[in-house]
């Protein structure tokens, strides 16, 4: 079967934003204008096509990113047929993991901002994630029909708060209820949308006289930005003072792909004014799979050997599983992004991370929640594979003959835990199965059994995250559960450096004995430039002359890591530890891996007396938006919660207070902040860093460990 759309006419994009910027409505309009949906779904009716889980429809927020395949020929039919794969991403902080993993497999992003509230804390998080993966993006300032909407103010905020260079390619005509259309700065025409066909078509007219000067001014800065793309364009611009439409687009495209600029457009998705031009901008400025760098990876046999795959059907097959979803009809769906090669249904692939072969039963492409069965996928495609037995988010599925492990995704450590138990004993096993499936879908959610109490503990990124997990257990798996009080994920670290400790484990009482002996130097690991402490262990080997044979070194590392889980002060896991093994001895007969593991574990245990341990608590970055009348109460309350106020600013929606507050003080804050402000304040919170906990909290924790 030949390729139906050439790969240079593919666009794999995500629509990202903070809560309530109108992202799902924008995605809905994209599906409508590209001909997939004949009835518009509105989020506030609970009818949006991409929000296909029941909770999403009830809460009106998007939780799982659904991948949708659409086609676009341009707002005026000016292009050949382009295949646009859209991934809808959630905007709620508790689901940043979803955003992170969709950005990992995208080539470009449309970042949606609200014309009234502009750059919000969540937008900064999404922007940082997009920077991390080097994702080219365009900006769509939505909700221009809302009170207080101002396109150029949001453009200015992007520059100041996100440190990026936005280049408007449009201006808004009118604002709030008088918002009627846009000025196209490339064609220098005014665009007015047709209400009769829900904004499918528009008419072009002369620019209104009162906007002429402003349009000229912004056009010249746009042309200048395009000219800076390369010498050829710059020379032409300097000689003639002008560039053609095609040259402007080419210059802007080159600079967008290099992540130097961000083209900015505006509109109102809800009022059907502007989304077709957002799609045009996707085609004009965002990359095809062939225009992004080859994807890097390593050889499964030797992780020091680097390898890469280009977006080409002739290269060996490689793909990344970026999402696992459970479907009521077909079982497990594995969403995969194909980077190279071709895969047909019935083929076998290698899961190179787990070293297992899997047979692909069927493959489907999603059009929101309808699916179309397909026979093959090629480089650049995004599809859902059915019949995978053991695949986790972030696994590589590739050719068996030419295997590769693509770069893994980083998943954050959970910061909050609760004990969960089924309402009836009969549901115990069912609950275990349900939690196992949910953990396979969502790598930022963990399940473990507390060895002492035998309770099942679930951990996640925030209260909302865990609420939704419990809710899904009830709806999808029919398991009702009671949950305990939230527990904070405390950590511990040491304060002393260069503490040298001897670990010796000897059992020699006739017959085959045990002998392990090592000297380890412990220090606090370096923190990064933001003051964040490294999560795991930094391990180094400085043993010379074979006093400890090489094959026992991994056992020493394992012994340290296992003991780190037990902490040194109050039994919480140890982080930010650097350990260097530098001496020791062994016995020809009695030494084995187990003995060295125990010796290292014994040495680590002594840090409790010698390492100057301290307890760390998670600190959250909290941003509260409140009307001015309640500002005093909100700030007083944050101070009572041991919050450090970082700054304040005025916005259209009220005063914004930024603070860093320990997570342990934030439980139930959603209810408290609402009652303090008569329901008018809202807040968002994300993990910032670990910091030392005050002595009264440490005493209580030590007492609790008893």
Curated annotation (Swiss-Prot):
Enumerate the SUPFAM superfamilies for this protein.
EF-G C-terminal domain-like (SSF54980), P-loop containing nucleoside triphosphate hydrolases (SSF52540), Ribosomal protein S5 domain 2-like (SSF54211), Translation proteins (SSF50447)
Entries under PROSITE patterns matching the protein: G_TR_1, G_TR_2
Keyword vocabulary terms for this entry: Cytoplasm, Elongation factor, GTP-binding, Nucleotide-binding, Protein biosynthesis
Domain tr-type G, residue spans? 8-290
- Molecular functions per Gene Ontology: GTP binding; GTPase activity; guanosine tetraphosphate binding; translation elongation factor activity
Biological process terms in GO annotation: ribosome disassembly
The chain's disulfide connectivity reads none
An example Gene Ontology cellular component term from the record?
A: cytosol
Concerning SMART domains, the annotation shows: EFG_C, EFG_IV
> Where does this polypeptide localize?
Cytoplasm
- Name any one Pfam family assigned in the record: EFG_C
Record has Endoplasmic reticulum as a keyword = no
| InterPro entries associated with the record | EFG_II, EFG_III, EFG_III/V, EFG_IV, EFG_V, EFG_V-like, EFTu-like_2, G_TR_CS
Q: Does the keyword Ribosomal protein apply?
A: no
Residues recorded as binding GTP, renumbered to this chain, are 17-24, 88-92, 142-145
Q: What does this protein do?
A: Catalyzes the GTP-dependent ribosomal translocation step during translation elongation. During this step, the ribosome changes from the pre-translocational (PRE) to the post-translocational (POST) state as the newly formed A-site-bound peptidyl-tRNA and P-site-bound deacylated tRNA move to the P and E sites, respectively. Catalyzes the coordinated movement of the two tRNA molecules, the mRNA and conformational changes in the ribosome.
Q: Which family does it belong to?
A: Belongs to the TRAFAC class translation factor GTPase superfamily. Classic translation factor GTPase family. EF-G/EF-2 subfamily.
Q: What is this protein called?
A: Elongation factor G 1
């Amino acid at each position: 079967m030949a390729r139906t759309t050439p790969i240079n006419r593919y666009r794999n994009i995500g629509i990202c934003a903070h809560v309530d910027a109108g992202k799902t409505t924008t995605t809905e309009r994209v599906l409508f204008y590209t001909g997939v949906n004949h009835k518009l779904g509105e989020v506030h009716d609970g009818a949006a096509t991409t929000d296909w889980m029941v909770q999403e429809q009830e809460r009106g927020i998007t939780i799982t990113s659904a991948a949708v395949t659409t086609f676009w020929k341009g707002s005026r039919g000016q292009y050949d047929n382009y295949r646009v794969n859209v991934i809808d991403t959630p905007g709620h902080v508790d689901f940043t993991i979803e955003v992170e993993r969709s950005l990992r497999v995208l080539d470009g992003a449309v970042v949606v901002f609200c014309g009234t509230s502009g750059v919000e804390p969540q937008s900064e998080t999404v922007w940082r994630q997009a920077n991390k993966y080097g994702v080219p993006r365009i900006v769509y300032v939505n909700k221009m029909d809302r009170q207080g909407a101002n396109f150029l103010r949001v453009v200015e905020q992007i520059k100041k708060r996100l440190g990026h260079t936005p280049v408007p390619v449009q201006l808004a005509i009118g604002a709030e209820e008088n918002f009627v259309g846009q000025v196209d700065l490339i064609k220098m025409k005014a665009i007015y949308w047709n209400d009769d066909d829900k904004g499918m078509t528009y008419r072009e007219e002369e620019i209104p006289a009162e906007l002429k000067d402003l349009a000229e001014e912004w056009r010249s800065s746009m042309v200048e930005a395009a000219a800076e793309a390369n010498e050829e364009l710059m020379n032409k611009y300097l000689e003639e003072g002008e560039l053609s439409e095609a040259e402007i687009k080419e210059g802007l495209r080159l600079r967008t792909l290099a992540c130097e600029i961000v083209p900015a457009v505006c509109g109102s998705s809800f009022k059907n004014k502007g989304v077709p031009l957002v799609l045009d901008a996707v085609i004009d400025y965002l990359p095809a799979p062939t225009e992004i760098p080859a994807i890097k990876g390593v050889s499964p046999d030797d992780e020091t050997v680097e390898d890469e795959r280009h977006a080409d059907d002739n290269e060996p097959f490689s793909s990344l599983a970026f999402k696992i979803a459970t479907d009521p009809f077909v079982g497990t769906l594995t969403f995969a992004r194909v980077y190279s090669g071709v895969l047909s249904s019935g083929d076998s692939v290698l899961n190179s991370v787990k070293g297992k072969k899997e047979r692909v039963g069927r493959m489907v492409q999603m059009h929101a929640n309808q699916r179309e069965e397909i026979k093959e996928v090629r480089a650049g495609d995004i599809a859902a594979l059915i019949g995978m037995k053991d695949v986790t988010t972030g696994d590589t599925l590739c050719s068996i003959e030419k295997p590769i492990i693509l770069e893994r995704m980083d998943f954050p450590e959970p910061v909050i835990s609760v004990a969960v138990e089924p309402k009836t004993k009969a549901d115990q096993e069912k609950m275990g199965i349900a939690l196992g499936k949910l953990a396979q879908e969502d790598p930022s959610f963990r399940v473990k059994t507390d060895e002492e109490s035998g309770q099942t503990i679930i951990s996640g990124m925030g209260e909302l995250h865990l609420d939704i997990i419990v809710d899904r257990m009830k709806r999808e798996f029919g398991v009702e559960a009671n949950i305990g009080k939230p527990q904070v994920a405390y950590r511990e670290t040491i304060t002393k450096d260069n503490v040298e400790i001897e670990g010796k484990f000897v059992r020699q009482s006739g017959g085959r004995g045990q002998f392990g002996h090592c000297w380890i130097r412990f220090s606090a690991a370096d923190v990064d430039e933001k003051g964040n402490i490294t999560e795991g262990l930094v391990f180094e080997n400085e043993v010379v002359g074979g006093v400890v044979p090489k094959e026992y070194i991994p056992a020493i590392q394992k012994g340290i890591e296992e003991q780190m889980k037990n902490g040194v002060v109050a039994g919480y896991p140890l982080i930010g530890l650097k350990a260097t093994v530098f001496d020791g001895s062994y016995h020809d007969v009695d030494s084995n891996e187990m003995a060295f593991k125990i010796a290292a574990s014994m040495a680590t245990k002594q840090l409790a007396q010698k390492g100057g341990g301290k307890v760390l608590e998670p600190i959250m970055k909290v941003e509260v938006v409140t009307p001015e009348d309640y500002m005093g109460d909100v700030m007083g309350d944050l101070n009572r919660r041991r919050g450090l106020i970082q700054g304040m600013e005025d916005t259209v929606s009220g005063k914004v207070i930024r603070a860093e507050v320990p997570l342990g003080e934030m439980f139930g804050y959603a209810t408290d902040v609402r009652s303090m402000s008569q329901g008018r304040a809202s807040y968002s919170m994300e993990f910032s860093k670990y910091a030392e906990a005050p002595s009264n909290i440490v005493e209580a924790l030590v007492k609790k460990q008893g």
